[in-house]
């Protein structure tokens, strides 16, 4: 039997992970990124951009449930949601499950990501692109948040790592723009890497976000194919009560929403804001 091909992630120089490739479904370099989707027996379809795993069919639900339901249920009455990135459609899928949301705007820099994900990762969007509340904007995220006249209750930055096209979504210009188009009491969240290996990302985001928001923190979730431990999500708002809501309040909102989740639940919501001591110490040691 011929040995299967292997795909090696290139995010880190001295260590990393690989996947056996059963079948390459799509591989093309666009104007912005090198995109590949392949099949793996353990994780189903895997999508990678510029040598870094972005999502897999098997564990994507953890990431998308936590990035969506934590801010939306903490907010409690979000009507207008902005997704930056998220071209695979899974973040959109989770937002559409909130029936009280009236409009969902997704800004994706690369139209190619959307088109090939609709074809090759249909389970991710699960038909959500056809939701009448949804609007797709092909634009740079920084440009959009600094130019739009729309305002939002929750902004979800489903960004890649701060390399290549995704780097701009970790800048002060982006965070300032998000604050500009966020309604009073609104919440901004963003993926912030695996903090054990990418701690500087969290520190840098915390420092920049603190210039624009009065309450900045992080919450976490364990996602197997994001190599290196616990994934960290940035959290920013001017309502410091939202990060400290009781499990009972979240439970009541969760039950009222009718959501059925595979990872998220109210107890996980509350616990996700408990950070490891090494991250707390690193954040506390930074100059104010």
Swiss-Prot record:
One GO process term, biological-process aspect: spermidine biosynthetic process
Compartment(s) of residence: Cytoplasm
UniProt-listed Enzyme Commission number(s): 2.5.1.16
GO molecular function: spermidine synthase activity
Active site: 158 (proton acceptor)
Cellular component annotations (GO), alphabetically ordered: cytosol
Pathway(s) served: Amine and polyamine biosynthesis; spermidine biosynthesis; spermidine from putrescine: step 1/1
Binding site for S-methyl-5'-thioadenosine: 33, 108, 140-141, 165
Catalytic activity: S-adenosyl 3-(methylsulfanyl)propylamine + putrescine = S-methyl-5'-thioadenosine + spermidine + H(+)
The PABS domain, residue ranges: 9-238
PROSITE patterns linked: PABS_1 (PS01330), PABS_2 (PS51006)
Keywords: Cytoplasm, Polyamine biosynthesis, Spermidine biosynthesis, Transferase
Major localization listed first in the record, in broad terms: cytoplasm
InterPro entries, A to Z: PABS, PABS_CS, SAM-dependent_MTases_sf, Spermi_synthase, Spermidine_synt_N, Spermidine_synt_N_sf
Positions contributing to spermidine binding: 64, 88, 158-161
UniProt-listed Pfam families: Spermine_synt_N (PF17284), Spermine_synth (PF01564)
NCBIfam families named in the record: MFS_SpdSyn (NF037959), PRK00811.1 (NF002010), speE (TIGR00417)
Function: Catalyzes the irreversible transfer of a propylamine group from the amino donor S-adenosylmethioninamine (decarboxy-AdoMet) to putrescine (1,4-diaminobutane) to yield spermidine.
Record family assignment: Belongs to the spermidine/spermine synthase family.
Subunit record text: Homodimer or homotetramer.
Full protein name: Polyamine aminopropyltransferase
Species: Escherichia coli O1:K1 / APEC
